[in-house]
Regions:
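An N-terminal, well-structured beta->alpha segment
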Residues: 1-45
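Glycine-rich phosphate-binding loops that contact phosphosugars or nucleotide phosphates
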Residues: 45-52, 56-164
Length: 164
């Protein structure tokens, strides 16, 4: 067991690492960011948001935020998309894809299907050299140096970066 002081210090360290991840995103804001926001603000259809694993959970949160602020949005799980759910996408929709690696098998199968539809694709990705980043119209860089978890395993800072 840890002492209360040790627990407090761990908490401060975790929050500091999360803060560093957000600062890195601030440094990464570029023209793609501005163009992606402009595209979202001018969409006449839905904003379709998708991801795999923890990125899918963040995608659902983003959809909830869009809907609560008046932007029509729907969640489409990337695994379900390649098994028939692509039917929810209309020609006037835009698609936001979230992925830490940008290299998951589901994303690699999904991207050609989405590109063939002609919708604008926004990647929120932690690897700007990834397959996803190279296929998207706009790339929002959510690269983080380390996760805030002690073993650098749980997607803590990377999911915070995606949500911001």
């Amino acid at each position: 067991l840890k002492t209360l002081e040790e627990i407090r210090e761990i908490g401060k360290r975790v929050i500091s690492q999360e803060n560093q991840a957000i600062a890195q995103i601030l440094a990464n804001i570029n023209t793609d960011f501005a163009e992606a926001v402009s595209t979202i603000l001018s969409v006449t259809g839905n904003v379709v948001v998708t991801g795999i694993g923890k990125s899918a959970i963040i995608a659902q949160k983003i959809v909830a935020t869009f809907n609560s602020t008046g932007t029509n949005a729907v969640f489409m799980h990337a695994a379900d998309a390649i098994h028939g759910d692509l039917g929810i996408i209309r020609e006037d929709d835009i698609i936001i894809l979230l992925s830490k690696s940008g290299e998951t098998p589901e994303i690699k199968v999904l991207m050609p299907l989405l590109k063939a539809r002609g919708n604008k694709l926004i990647a929120i990705v932690g690897n700007t050299e990834s397959y996803l980043a190279k296929q998207a119209n706009f790339v929002l860089d959510t690269t983080v140096e380390t996760e805030a978890c002690p073993n650098n395993l749980a997607p803590t800072s990377s999911t915070t970066a995606q949500m911001v």
